[in-house]
Amino acid sequence: MPAEANQVIENIKLIPGGEELVNKAILSLNRSAEDAVKEATPIFKNAIRNMSIADAGKILFGPDSAATAYLRQTTYQELKTAFAPKVRASLDKPLVAGVSTNETWNTLSDAYNKVANTMVAKIAGLKPVNISLEEYATQKALDALFVKVAEEEKAIRTDPVARINEILKRVFGQLDKK
């Protein structure tokens, strides 16, 4: 959950059944990311197919994160566009009693913000929560995807066993000869 949601979450947990609701909402956020990540493969394949010889050379002989940086630069916006509807659909699935994670978040954050916007709450240091759960989940899914890509890239560059096909063996094998 977004850090901005901590005050809301802590108060929800005080309500009977609130902790279960929070846990289900977190699970729903995780599932939304899993649903969205499936969209990455064709987008990555397209970026690799459209790679120039110069780009390939920069990746091969560049820093350990060159491939990850290339994919982030060439696919990020397209991935974000592809992920957003998947994340939204997942967060719109019924969570408890036919109410979705998005509906629950919007209701709770609206109620919290009504309190947080009062003079007493401002004096007490409460701040309104203004974050889109969909945008947050989409961003976190993209962050996690590129962390995984970076881990795979590091393995391919440093461990010949991670080079699972002939192309990877032939291309990245050149690094072993240095």
Give the role of each language-model region.
Residues 104, 111-127:
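Extended amphipathic ligand-handling, pore-lining, and cofactor/metal-binding catalytic surfaces
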Residues 127-130, 134:
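Mature, extracytoplasmic segments of signal peptide-bearing proteins
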Residues 1-36:
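N-terminal Sec/ER secretory leader and immediately downstream segment
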Residues 64-111:
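A contiguous pocket-lining binding segment that forms or flanks enzyme active sites
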Residues 134-178:
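A cross-kingdom marker for long, charged
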Residues 82-90, 94, 115, 141-148, ...:
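Hydrophobic alpha-helical segments of membrane proteins
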Residues 22-70:
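Extracytoplasmic beta-rich ectodomain segments of secreted or membrane-anchored proteins
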